[in-house]
Swiss-Prot record:
One of its GO terms (biological process) is diaminopimelate biosynthetic process. The keyword Oxidoreductase applies. This is Meso-diaminopimelate D-dehydrogenase. It comes from the Bacteria. Keywords: Amino-acid biosynthesis, Diaminopimelate biosynthesis, Lysine biosynthesis, NADP, Oxidoreductase. It comes from Corynebacterium glutamicum (strain ATCC 13032 / DSM 20300 / JCM 1318 / BCRC 11384 / CCUG 27702 / LMG 3730 / NBRC 12168 / NCIMB 10025 / NRRL B-2784 / 534). Is composed of three domains: a dinucleotide binding domain, a dimerization domain, and a substrate-binding domain. The gene is ddh. It catalyses: meso-2,6-diaminopimelate + NADP(+) + H2O = (S)-2-amino-6-oxoheptanedioate + NH4(+) + NADPH + H(+). The enzyme is also inhibited by L-cysteine, and by p-chloromercuribenzoate, iodoacetic acid and HgCl(2) in vitro. Homodimer. Disulfide bonds: none annotated.
Length: 320
């Protein structure tokens, strides 16, 4: 069987992780990386992102390793014209619209576009649906962390005077236990998570910066917030990793008997796990096209066996 020919669009943290992990796949060959930059620190062939159409006959799947704020919404439909695509679009509220736009582009080209892969959306999405379907009368809560929030960290770094900063999202242990007991029905996201900030800044700016953090709407207002000012050496030695994870907890009653389904992720490096998920769904996208399908699909619409490099008979014999 011929290997799946894949390429990467974008070369940030996620793109580098995808590149590294494709080398571990038994059924994929990396054709190249499409970038706006002329040169990259890699041995993989680099092509101008404007020339994707010139390589359409050489690529089966494009891994779109771009930002969700503007890049994916604006550019992903164009890429779906030339190959199957897999993205990690994570604006939850806008996923239905994104799926519709990608469906139009992919269907017109006869390709498959898998949208919003990763872990949330992605693996957490699948678990939410499975657990809720099994427990018809249920409470369900998603907790994020402990882990680095890239969006909130970026917000900290935009504050004048901040030299370096990271923000960790921490789930409330009390809220976790309430969720496991089925007693967290009235808790909001702001009550279930804590924002922990580590900031490098001149001492004269500390008071103003802390006030700016605590009063920042959409990011910190309403949350329990902890602000820690540290020196640059401590920051560089202790706060340059990218851990993350979380819990999906579903509790339900089946006529007097209580049940709990808890799905946990503990990730040493967020981009690597997100890339691993994206790659598995890339395999599925290629197989779905081979089966004659086209259009856009979420992770909920993909048969699990399509993700695995192993054949279905072996999976059934071992895992069912």
């Amino acid at each position: 069987m011929t290997n799946i020919r894949v390429a990467i669009v974008g070369y940030g943290n996620l793109g580098r992780s995808v590149e590294k992990l494709i080398a571990k796949q038994p059924d994929m060959d990396l054709v190249g990386i499409f970038s706006r930059r002329a040169t990259l620190d890699t041995k993989t062939p680099v092509f101008d992102v404007a020339d994707v159409d010139k390589h359409a006959d050489d690529v089966d799947v494009l891994f779109l390793c771009m930002g969700s704020a503007t890049d994916i919404p604006e550019q992903a439909p164009k890429f779906a014209q030339f190959a199957c695509t897999v993205d990690t679009y994570d604006n939850h509220r806008d996923i239905p619209r994104h799926r519709q736009v990608m469906n139009e582009a992919a269907t017109a080209a006869g390709n498959v576009a898998l949208v919003s892969t990763g872990w949330d959306p992605g693996m957490f999405s699948i678990n939410r649906v499975y657990a809720a379907a099994v427990l018809a009368e249920h409470q369900q809560h998603t907790f994020w962390g402990p882990g680095l929030s890239q969006g909130h960290s970026d917000a900290l770094r935009r504050i004048p005077g901040v030299q370096k900063a990271v923000q960790y999202t921490l789930p409330s242990e009390d809220a976790l236990e309430k969720a496991r007991r089925g007693e967290a029905g009235d808790l909001t996201g702001k009550q279930t998570h804590k924002r922990q900030c580590f900031v490098v800044a001149d001492a004269a700016d500390h008071e103003r910066i802390e006030n700016d953090i605590r009063t920042m709407p959409d990011y910190f207002v309403g949350y329990e917030v902890e602000v820690n000012f540290i020196d640059e050496a401590t920051f560089d030695s202790e706060h340059t990793g990218m851990p993350h994870g979380g819990h999906v907890i579903t509790t339900g009653d089946t006529g007097g008997f209580n049940h709990t389904v808890e799905y946990i992720l503990k990730l040493d490096r967020n981009p690597d796990f997100t890339a691993s998920s994206q790659i598995a769904f890339g395999r599925a996208a290629h197989r779905m096209k081979q089966q004659g399908q086209s259009g856009a699909f979420t992770v909920l619409e993909v048969a699990p066996y399509l993700l695995s490099p192993e054949n279905l008979d072996d999976l059934i014999a071992r895992d069912v």
